[in-house]
């Protein structure tokens, strides 16, 4: 966990991936730092301080989800994103709101398990190599030297067998030492071996997914799993692939699942972040029977956000200290349309601004994972070096901004399809082009995207 970052450092880290939206970055940075501050308090005071949940308001594609996701990744906190529209009021068919907490705990278990596996990786690989040696040089089946029951009683023929067994064991040990040396030197990586691996069984309870009955299915499956033996099957693999599978199996045996569960539940409770998207879709006054469950979903979410105990297969989980970040465009409704009790549980409100042409220019070139860098890397695999002139980048940004203005504003996502359209012919012909270097100019951009920029009817089909 990396809770030691200062708010300024957190904002600087987020700036590497997200352009603009300073207010949102500051809000999440302070929320994260407050978790660190809370961890330093005396226990009696620590229990009194709950995180201040955040409501992000802004159109699609401006970075609401990305801010929360990058924040969680930065500190290694368990994080899940859910859509408010996927939940239904208790009593209706669909997912109940408590499933978001169960999903968070599952994510936390996965994170902790991966960390534990890394810690035991060396020992697991050592044991996997030992198993490979035993597979490559198997022990001979011991045959009984007794020919009749009387020899078992009086020990006849045993001494001669012991001598031959000892000689055979010495020879096998020599062979194994030789194989160990070759394995360490990487000389047997392509050798084919036959190993037994635990078979991954598809769950008969997968059909319950999305019905609100997943938890019941998982609990029943776990109960059955403790009685049913695990199935294994033989697979023929190269030593290199077999080592990966065997190392994973050994690592699973070495980690203590009770310790994993305990740490995972603690992290979910104290450090977990739940991002509730499209919360504006469940806001608004009930006007017809279709909207009947909107307020019901809000009232079901309320106790989770307020703080309650949710039953999971890993035990009861308290939601009092989970940070909730809700987001919505609020085109058709406004935050005040949420029920007052739920509004009060999101005291920090941040409005994200629409992206300008200058923002689009920065998005194209500045982030570590900038779009232009991605396309340059993709085409470089074909031996083609492409570069974009500053004027061409500005032209792309202007067209993306204009299409957003003329049609639906989908924010930075517009750049993805604009770039795809721009480089469509080049990507198609890349494997046949003999040129090693291509420069994208404003004229090239104009030629490829002119119809989109000028024709409103056409631009509606460019997402």
Curated annotation (Swiss-Prot):
The keyword Cytoplasm applies. One of its GO terms (biological process) is proteolysis involved in protein catabolic process. The keyword Transport does not apply. One of its GO terms (molecular function) is proteasome-activating activity. Keywords: ATP-binding, Chaperone, Cytoplasm, Nucleotide-binding. Signal peptide: none annotated. It is found in: Cytoplasm. InterPro entries: AAA+_ATPase, ATP-dep_Clp_protease_ClpX, ATPase_AAA_core, Clp_ATPase_C, HslU, P-loop_NTPase. One of its GO terms (cellular component) is HslUV protease complex. ATP binds at residues 19, 61-66, 277, 341, 413. ATPase subunit of a proteasome-like degradation complex; this subunit has chaperone activity. The binding of ATP and its subsequent hydrolysis by HslU are essential for unfolding of protein substrates subsequently hydrolyzed by HslV. HslU recognizes the N-terminal part of its protein substrates and unfolds these before they are guided to HslV for hydrolysis. A double ring-shaped homohexamer of HslV is capped on each side by a ring-shaped HslU homohexamer. The assembly of the HslU/HslV complex is dependent on binding of ATP. NCBIfam families: hslU (TIGR00390), PRK05201.1 (NF003544). Belongs to the ClpX chaperone family. HslU subfamily. This is ATP-dependent protease ATPase subunit HslU. It comes from Bacillus cereus (strain B4264).
């Amino acid at each position: 966990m990396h809770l030691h970052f200062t708010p300024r450092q957190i904002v600087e880290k987020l700036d590497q991936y997200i352009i603009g939206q300073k207010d949102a970055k500051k809000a999440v940075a302070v929320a994260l730092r407050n978790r660190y501050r809370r961890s330093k308090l005396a226990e009696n005071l620590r229990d009194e301080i709950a995180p201040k949940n955040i409501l992000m308001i802004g159109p699609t594609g401006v970075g609401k989800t990305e801010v929360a996701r990058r924040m969680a990744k930065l500190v290694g906190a368990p994080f899940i994103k859910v859509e408010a529209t996927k939940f239904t009021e208790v009593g209706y068919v669909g997912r109940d709101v408590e499933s978001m907490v169960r999903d968070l705990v599952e994510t936390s278990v996965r994170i902790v398990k991966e960390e534990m596996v890394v810690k035991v990786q060396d020992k697991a690989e050592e044991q996997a190599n030992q198993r490979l040696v035993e597979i490559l040089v198997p022990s001979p089946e011991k045959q009984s030297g007794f020919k009749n029951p009387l020899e078992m009683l009086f020990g006849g023929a045993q001494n001669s067998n012991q001598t031959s067994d000892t000689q055979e064991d010495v020879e096998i040990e020599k062979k194994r030492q030789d194989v160990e040396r070759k394995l360490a030197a990487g000389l047997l990586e392509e050798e084919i071996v036959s190993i037994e691996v635990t078979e991954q069984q598809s769950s008969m309870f997968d059909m319950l997914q999305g019905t609100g009955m997943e938890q019941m299915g998982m609990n029943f499956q776990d109960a059955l799993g403790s009685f049913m033996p695990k199935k294994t099957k033989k697979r023929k693999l190269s030593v290199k692939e077999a080592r990966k599978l065997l190392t994973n199996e050994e690592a699973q045996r070495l980690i203590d699942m009770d310790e994993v569960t305990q740490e995972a539940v603690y992290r979910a409770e104290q450090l977990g972040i739940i991002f509730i998207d499209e919360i504006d879709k469940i806001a608004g006054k009930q006007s017809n029977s279709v909207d009947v469950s909107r307020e019901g979903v809000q009232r079901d979410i309320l106790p989770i956000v307020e703080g309650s105990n949710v039953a999971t297969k890993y035990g009861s989980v308290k939601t009092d200290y989970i940070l909730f970040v809700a987001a919505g465009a609020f085109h058709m409704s406004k935050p005040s349309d949420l029920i007052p009790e739920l509004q009060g549980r999101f005291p920090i409100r941040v409005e994200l601004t629409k992206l300008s042409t200058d923002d689009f220019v920065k998005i194209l070139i500045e982030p570590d994972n900038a779009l232009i860098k991605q396309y340059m890397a993709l085409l470089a695999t074909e031996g083609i070096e492409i570069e974009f002139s500053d004027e061409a980048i500005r032209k792309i940004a202007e067209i993306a901004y204009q299409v957003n203005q003329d049609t639906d504003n989908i924010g930075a996502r517009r750049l993805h399809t604009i770039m795809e359209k721009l480089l469509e012919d080049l990507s198609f012909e890349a494997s046949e082009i003999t040129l090693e270097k291509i420069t994208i100019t404003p004229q090239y951009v104009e030629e490829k995207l002119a119809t989109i920029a000028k024709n409103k009817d056409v631009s509606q089909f460019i997402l």
